[in-house]
């Protein structure tokens, strides 16, 4: 496995792979890797001849400087995990390598609508930072396939739209959320939880499952479902941030024509902001 830190070396390796006719998969990450990321690598390996994993804590997608500063950097451990899993390349650039002119003068990619709704409304600039860095990685790596986790539901929708709108000839693969045995969605931010909070954390998915059961049973009073869920989370010790039930295909409000709903969960537990989601087939 080759660890690459500069754009020229990355381009050199990509040119070589292209000359050899290799199919390339990209797995974009911010590091602090867990089993969910390893599932992305597995999917990438099954879909291509060469797997490039990027590890870059992207400052452009953080709306708070303190959040950026405390985000875990575990490059050595990450590379050891990736080597064991069979990744071929790790691209681990510095911010200066990715944004040589600084971020204030950086051209950016913005996806209208999806960037500013839901999660984007409470995190200004976050999705613009995501779409910009992913677009840059697409240009540098020139992958045939790129793998993203379904845990970040809105992000995946945004990447799919950006890929289509910008004319990238890249297959976007969404990989199902990996969960701990108690149901908690794996996330790098779970490391912010204390041991006591970690015991409470699976309550997020339990409340989400209850919401899904109500939808499957035909209940359509969304305000009542969300209010009950918010109360249940508060009783467990969470601070509900944003609970939504939307059309799974458009992320707009549910309509009589909606065939699938998505439950989007965001709640604070101590210093950790936990997110989760679940899609539900709707009976007409």
Curated annotation (Swiss-Prot):
UniProtKB keywords: ATP-binding, Cytoplasm, Ligase, Nucleotide-binding, Pantothenate biosynthesis
Residues at the catalytic site: 37
Pfam families assigned to the protein according to its UniProt record, in alphabetical order: Pantoate_ligase
Record has Protein transport as a keyword: no
Catalytic activity entry: (R)-pantoate + beta-alanine + ATP = (R)-pantothenate + AMP + diphosphate + H(+)
Subcellular location(s) of the protein: Cytoplasm
Subcellular location, principal: cytoplasm
Binding site for (R)-pantoate: 61, 155
Positions of ATP binding: 30-37, 149-152, 178, 186-189
EC number: 6.3.2.1
Pathway: Cofactor biosynthesis; (R)-pantothenate biosynthesis; (R)-pantothenate from (R)-pantoate and beta-alanine: step 1/1
Amino acids binding beta-alanine: 61
SUPFAM superfamilies in alphabetical order: Nucleotidylyl transferase (SSF52374)
GO MF term set: ATP binding; pantoate-beta-alanine ligase activity
Highest taxon, organism lineage: Bacteria
Miscellaneous note of the record: The reaction proceeds by a bi uni uni bi ping pong mechanism.
Subunit structure: Homodimer.
Family listed: Belongs to the pantothenate synthetase family.
NCBIfam families to which the protein is assigned, alphabetical: cyt_tran_rel (TIGR00125), panC (TIGR00018)
Role according to the record: Catalyzes the condensation of pantoate with beta-alanine in an ATP-dependent reaction via a pantoyl-adenylate intermediate.
Protein name: Pantothenate synthetase
Organism: Cronobacter sakazakii (strain ATCC BAA-894) (Enterobacter sakazakii)
Lineage, highest ranks first: Bacteria, Pseudomonadati, Pseudomonadota, Gammaproteobacteria, Enterobacterales
The gene coding this protein: panC
């Amino acid at each position: 496995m080759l660890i690459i830190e500069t754009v020229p070396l990355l381009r050199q390796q990509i040119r070589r792979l292209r000359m050899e006719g290799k199919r390339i998969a990209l797995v974009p990450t911010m590091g602090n890797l867990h089993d969910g990321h390893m599932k992305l690598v597995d999917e990438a390996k099954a879909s291509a001849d060469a797997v490039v994993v990027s590890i870059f804590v992207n400052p452009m997608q953080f709306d708070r400087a303190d959040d950026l500063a405390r985000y875990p950097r575990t490059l050595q451990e990450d590379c050891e995990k990736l080597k064991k899993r069979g990744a071929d390349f790790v691209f681990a650039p510095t911010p200066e390598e990715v944004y040589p002119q600084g971020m204030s003068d950086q051209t950016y990619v913005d996806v209208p609508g999806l960037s500013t709704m839901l999660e984007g409304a409470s995190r200004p600039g976050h999705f613009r930072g995501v779409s910009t860095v992913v677009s840059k990685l697409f240009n540098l790596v020139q992958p045939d396939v790129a793998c993203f986790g379904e845990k970040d539901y809105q992000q995946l929708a945004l990447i799919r739209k950006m890929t289509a709108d910008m004319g990238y000839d890249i297959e976007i693969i969404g990989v199902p959320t990996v969960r701990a045995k108690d149901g908690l969605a794996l996330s790098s931010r779970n490391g912010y939880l204390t041991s006591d909070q970690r015991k409470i954390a699976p309550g997020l998915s339990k409340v989400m499952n209850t919401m899904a059961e109500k939808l499957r049973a035909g209940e359509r009073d969304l305000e009542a479902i969300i209010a009950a869920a918010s109360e249940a989370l508060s009783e467990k010790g969470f601070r509900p941030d944003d609970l939504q039930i939307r059309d799974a295909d458009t992320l707009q409000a549910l309509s009589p024509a909606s065939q699938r709903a998505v439950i989007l969960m965001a709640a604070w537990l101590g210093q950790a902001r936990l997110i989760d989601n679940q899609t539900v087939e709707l009976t007409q």
